[in-house]
Structures are given as structure tokens and as C-alpha cells.
Amino acid sequence: MTGKKRSASSSRWLHEHFSDKYVQQAQKKGLRSRAWFKLDEIQQSDKLFKPGMTVVDLGAAPGGWSQYVVTQIGGKGRIIACDLLPMDPIVGVDFLQGDFRDELVMKALLERVGDSKVQVVMSDMAPNMSGTPAVDIPRAMYLVELALEMCRDVLAPGGSFVVKVFQGEGFDEYLREIRSLFTKVKVRKPDSSRARSREVYIVATGRK
């Protein structure tokens, strides 16, 4: 911390983080992040992943979701993952490092998907948070709109979409947009999601 004292809020966050039971379980199990548990809860209720599927993972680093999905889709399945940050390799995951908002990165990602029939698009993307909702929510909504655009481009009929969304301005409109594209849409707040967080997960199945 370059010799400076931590702020009260950052110290509180660190204490909360390391005393979090899901963080502790992730460390014990050798998991990459507590996000593994969120996706496990969603899978238990919605049964999105099956052996042999092709899955796109947006905002993948450090790899918690990809690490989980590999256990569900098996050796014949395939994950195409993307993140601005680096990610250590995972067997069965084709990782592209780059900014998903960049047109060239989007093009490279689509090339990796190729002619594959994608059964699930999942997005855990989030912007760097400033703590100011008027700034953070529009940035977050832009990312989830891009994720939905990816669904339009690559998701097979009958496919599924799971996306982290921060509740706030634009949320209801985005939910309506998803409902127009999928036959069944649920809003989930996993137990492993921190209670005070604005995040929820939209789980949409049955791409029209």
C-alpha cells in the first residue's frame, strides 16, 4: 500500500472478503474464485450445462465459471472464453485475452466460435466500479448489452443465456429485451452473492 494506511472502507472490504465462507471454501477446494459457487447454484436450479456443449464465457478471468463448466460439459465439450485480464490456462478452454468492447476482439472471438452451435452464452462481466451508481450502472449496462448482442450472433435456437446484471437504471428495459428473445426468463440472486451487492443473475432459456 506504498506506506499509506488503508481507508476504512477498503479495510472493511478486505475483512469481509477473507471472512466470507465462500472465499474460504474456494481456497480450500483450490477454486479460482467464489464465482464458482454462484454458477453451481444456478446449475442446480436451471440445469443449463450438459455434456458435449459449446459455451461462450465473457468476463472469464480468473476462470471460476470456466473451471466449473468444464466439470459439467466433459471432454467433448468446448469453452470459448474472453477477458481483458489474463487467465491461467484451463484444459478444454480456448481463451482470448482482449477488450470485448473492441471490434477487433469481438471479430476474433466470433472467428474462434466459427460454425460451432453455441448452447450457452454466459457473462460475468463488470466494469471497474467507481462507487458512483450514476457512472457505474451505465457502464455495466453497456457490457450486458454487448453480451446480449453476442447471443444474437452465435446462440443456437433453444440455447441459454446467463448474465450478471446490476440493478438500477435500464434494468427493466434490458429484462424486457431478453424476454422478447427467450421463452423462459428468471432473475436469480444466489446465496453466494453478497447480500448488499446490486448484482443479480438473469437466466434465460429457450432462445427463440
UniProtKB/Swiss-Prot annotation:
UniProt EC number: 2.1.1.166
Top class in the EC scheme: transferase
Binding site for S-adenosyl-L-methionine: 63, 65, 83, 99, 124
MF GO annotations: rRNA (uridine-2'-O-)-methyltransferase activity
Active site per database record: 164
Job description of the protein: Specifically methylates the uridine in position 2552 of 23S rRNA at the 2'-O position of the ribose in the fully assembled 50S ribosomal subunit.
Name of the protein in question: Ribosomal RNA large subunit methyltransferase E
Species for this entry: Salmonella paratyphi C (strain RKS4594)
